Design a protein with these regions (language model features):
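Short, linear, compositionally biased motifs with a strong N-terminal bias
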Residues: 10-11
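Small beta-barrel nucleic-acid-binding modules, primarily SNase/OB-fold domains
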Residues: 2-5, 14-162
Length: 162
């Protein structure tokens, strides 16, 4: 006879990893591309939107990106398809609201995000380029600083002041 606890653990873990899909309610928005959710399995998860990067706190449009994401997903039920983890262990996910609305598209269309620095997704790159051509959001600037460059600059500044 199989151990009931072992079977329960297998069933619960399959809910999280089967197809890498999490379903739950967004409990907080950390920044323009990061949020926390309480999944239906009662575990909390920190999720970063896969394939985009929004301005960092301290950069122009960071607060607007955060507020835009809050309006779209805070306290709403979402489905998150986990794509993997970044080098810091953060879960990267594709989020759908009501099964069809992808907040990455809205952030890119409004000019509030860049596509990923490495291996950009062509669909997202196309949306970003349209926003750039129209001069939306951060693309009003001649040469806005991408968040990955900003983070590196901040790290160097901190190292120099230490």
């Amino acid at each position: 006879m199989k151990n009931p606890l072992f079977i329960a653990l297998i069933i619960l873990s399959s809910n999280v990893f089967a197809g890498n899909i999490l379903t739950g309610k967004v409990t907080s928005v950390i920044d323009g591309n990061t949020f926390e959710m309480l999944a239906d399995d009662n575990d909390s998860y920190k999720i970063m939107l896969f394939g985009i990067d929004c301005p960092e706190p301290g950069q122009e449009f960071a607060e607007k990106a955060k507020k835009t994401l809050e309006k779209m997903i805070l306290n709403k039920k979402v489905n998150v398809t986990i794509q993997g983890k970044d080098r810091w262990g953060n879960r990267l996910g594709v989020v759908l609201i009501d099964g069809t609305i992808d907040p990455r598209h809205d952030l890119l269309e409004a000019g509030l995000a860049w596509t990923a620095e490495r291996d950009p997704i062509q669909e997202l790159e196309t949306i970003k380029e349209k926003a750039r051509e129209k001069g939306k959001g951060l693309w009003k600037e001649q040469d806005p600083t991408p968040p990955w460059i900003y983070r590196r600059q901040q790290t160097l500044t901190q190292l120099k002041s230490s």
